[in-house]
Amino acid sequence: ELRVGARENRTAKAISDIAHFTLEYARNNIGSKPGLARKHMFSSRVMPSSRAVITSLNRPHRYDELHAPWSVAVGMLTTHLENYLMRWDFTPQEMLELLSYTTTNWHPLIEHIFKTIFAQAPAKGLPVTYCRNPSLERASIQLLYLTLVKSDPRDPTYSFSLLDIVGCNADFDGDEMSAILPVDNELAHLLEPLKPHKSAHSVTKY
């Protein structure tokens, strides 16, 4: 009986140790800030999206305006750029070479396409949801409008209004935020409740 009890005790202890190891591994290696989930799942981008450091927009602007860095915009708007390049009879190889080059270098043709895209946008610009992970509080995700791509590839930052930083609990000390471009106008319309001015009042008091 003692032997059976000892064996059962060892079995229970082994199960307990395995459970403890699993919990600690998940906490330290998967769920922590440098963990696997943040590296490979939460930090992985969907198309078309981007993530970059934020800075304040210090030129005259609308409160819901967003200016994107050059290299980030080339990546996020690759499909849009390829669509225009195909109209001008670029081959797939030529498109790949041009977009690879312009990821880190300014190019007049790409800037012309960017300006054309914004000019043809049905709204104020291209609507994007803008979020600072991992915040999920009200107004942490806002619908802003991408109106300009910075022409200096050396500036790797998104710029947006000081009026929009409270909801996403952001500041300009190196914080990064992510932007996702809705795939069609129907989805953009459904996201309109995320506009910054719709979070100006408390949902419980007004």
Regions flagged by a language model, labelled:
Residues 206:
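Phosphate-backbone binding interfaces of nucleic-acid-interacting proteins
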Residues 1-203:
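Core mixed alpha/beta domains of very large multi-subunit molecular machines
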